[in-house]
Amino acid sequence: MRDYEGNGVDIDNNGASPYSQHISRDHENERDSSRSRDKERDKGRDKDRDRDRNRDRDRDRDRVKERDKDRHRDRDGEKDRDRHHRDRHRDRSDRRERERTRDRDEDDLHRSRDYDRRRDNDKDREDRRRHRPSSRGRSEHRSKSRSRSPSKSKRISGFDMAPPTTALLPGATDAAGQVPGTNPAIPGLFSNMFPLASSQFGALPMMPVQAMTQQATRHARRVYVGGLPPTANEQSVATFFSHVMYAIGGNTAGPGDAVVNVYINHEKKFAFVEMRSVEEASNAMALDGVIFEGGPVKVRRPSDYNPSLAATLGPSQPSPNLNLAAVGSTPGSSGGLEGPDRIFVGGLPYYFTESQIRELLESFGQLRGFDLVKDRETGNSKGYAFCVYQDVSVTDIACAALNGIKMGDKTLTVRRANQGTTQPNPEQESVLLHAQQQIALQRFMLQPGALATKVLCLTEVVTVDELNDDDDYQDILEDMRTECEKFGALVNVVIPRPNPNGVPTPGLGKVFLEYADVDGSSKARQGLNGRKFGGNQVVAVFYPENKFSEGDYEA
């Protein structure tokens, strides 16, 4: 119902005008709009908060991930550091291992070379023993450079390692081949051979003198054993003869083995057996024909045996008290070529056969023993022989009748083999004089402060048998050069050789080494003196330079 109409204003029943109602509606709309805006604003803020929360969550998550990554990186870094340390340690270990391996390789190389050399040495040494008759058993094979067939590798040094220092002291009296704890091989030898007053030289060092004893008596201490079976070797021969000598009571130098060394030639089936003493070697002569490995063997004196000189060294006949029955032998079963009635027959034509020579000799009576000396290599006669008659009373008759007889282009020389033993013959006098000079020389050289020279003299190195063969001689020269130039500049090596006509050679058996300076010779003397060469103990002394330059090798 409208209350007012005159002024155009409508008023409702409640008394409100339309205008006010319109305003009121606007206000309500505005409030609604404001509320809507507030709601929208709140929604926006909520969205922002949610977005912020989500962002914070994402940030936290990223931060956590980043921390985890950092942690992993740190862990990886530690692993890397550990790996780096391990790598460095491994590198160091590898480097050390490589160095050790290189050192081991070098050592192995040296050892391998040494082993190869030793193996070749042993092989060559065995070949030499098998194929050559000389005392050290050198091989017949020679190097191609010498145009000899079959070929042979280079000779191996005969030197062994240096002996203990006690072997070089004056009190060390055990000589090469002498069993420790036993008496010397030849008691009283030097009082008979070298009548030198003790005041003349004073107390001599024993080692060089005993070494000289071994050299001086070697020819009388060796026996030749022929007819060996193919299976024989050095060890079996040494064991057999040591056992047999003990069984017959032939050991006179004390307890232990009588055999010192054995040099065997497998091709020619013979050996040289070296005994401890002259007396034991003489006892071994009673073993001629003894059964060895199923067959008899011949036991003889070697070709270098000197009966005249041996007579001054010890018994030359076997002991009559030997128990030969212990080995199945009987006294007198040997060839009977020993004793004062032994005859030397020289100047025989080389083409004479053994039967022809026997026929000539037996024209004076039956022979108890006969031995035609033959070349070990070729088997040909050397032009001389030895014999003993059953009736010794015909000995001088045969000598007088046969001596001086012309046989073809030769003239016979027939005499007692031991003729002149009461007085030293020229050869014996030479040996004794040489021994006296050697003692005097060594006494001077071994005195404290003795004058050193550039020349060194070695004894106890080579034997006469080894110097006769040209190729053996060249081998020894090479051997000496190879070994001795290790100590200094080696200028010259001189090794005197035997004269083919039998005239004594000054310095025979010695080796002279000339160095560029005294330092080299002094080192060589220190390194070589007392060492073993082929089983012999080497004696090294300085030698006067003026004598060496003049070719005087006798002092």
Curated annotation (Swiss-Prot):
Compartments, record wording: Nucleus
Summary of the tissues where the protein is detected? Expressed in stems, leaves and apical buds.
Q: Where is the composition biased (Basic residues)?
A: 143-155
Q: Where is this region: Disordered?
A: 1-165
Q: Which GO terms describe its cellular component?
A: nucleus
Q: Extract the coiled-coil ranges from the record.
A: none
| Molecular function per GO | RNA binding
What is one Pfam family matched by this protein? RRM_1
What are the residue boundaries of the RRM domain, all occurrences included? 221-304, 341-419, 460-546
| Keyword set, alphabetical order | mRNA processing, mRNA splicing, Nucleus, Repeat, RNA-binding
**Which InterPro entries does this chain map to?**
Nucleotide-bd_a/b_plait_sf, RBD_domain_sf, RRM_dom, RRM_dom_euk, U2AF_lg
Regions of biased composition (Basic and acidic residues) lie at 23-81, 90-127
PROSITE patterns attached to this UniProt entry: RRM
- GO BP terms in the entry: mRNA processing; RNA splicing
Domain comment? Answer: N-terminal RS domain has a very strong bias in favor of D over S.
Q: Which family does it belong to?
A: Belongs to the splicing factor SR family.
Its function? Necessary for the splicing of pre-mRNA. Binds to the U -enriched regions of plant introns.
Q: What is this protein called?
A: Splicing factor U2af large subunit A
Q: Which organism is it from?
A: Nicotiana plumbaginifolia
Q: Show the taxonomic lineage.
A: Eukaryota, Viridiplantae, Streptophyta, Embryophyta, Tracheophyta
